[in-house]
């Protein structure tokens, strides 16, 4: 239920707490179990209505950690409340930076470039659908797994996130995306020379611009729009390739 509620993390985004309202709302099912007393539950809910801003997919890791530490709060462990507040502050920055590298600068542009390359090589309309499915398959799996991973790690999550594996993975994804993007660019140029003319070149460059825009960090609203921009770019590329093959581009 917490992972499902995290889908609405940014629904009540505001300039005072950013994602704070959505974060606290997502925690409600867990807080309801841990704190049966309504007054105590309300007190703990208010404690989480503070500034929170992180990657929307990795934020569920923080939710799992918080619920694990809320067990200690419910048992009355000394200093548990202060420890929860401190760890949330650490995690929002750490998960935000890691999410930017893994998702916004890594997985999304790499997958978009790969889909564009397959489209130029002759893939059908299914390429756009495959891009959409693969992007969401990974990101939503991370969202779902994040709650249980965070809960299992508890306060030890800091050591897990400091593992160089995450940075190496992000760097490898960016490098792979750049290589595939270069291949897509070369194929697009070849497509234009094979008969696409100015119209084919214009369509191709417009598609590349959309893919580039989709790969940029555009703020909370833009990030939700970016996968759709990449999807649109892939569809346009498919259309351009079809027109060039049919000889309709002057």
Model-derived segments and spans:
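Transmembrane alpha-helical segments and their cytosolic interface motifs
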Residues: 86-119, 178-185
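Helix-coil boundary and interhelical linker segments in multi-pass alpha-helical membrane proteins
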Residues: 116-129, 188-197
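Alpha-helical transmembrane segments of helical membrane proteins, especially in multi-pass transport
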Residues: 139, 143-147, 164-194
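Juxtamembrane boundary at the C-terminal end of a transmembrane helix
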Residues: 235-250
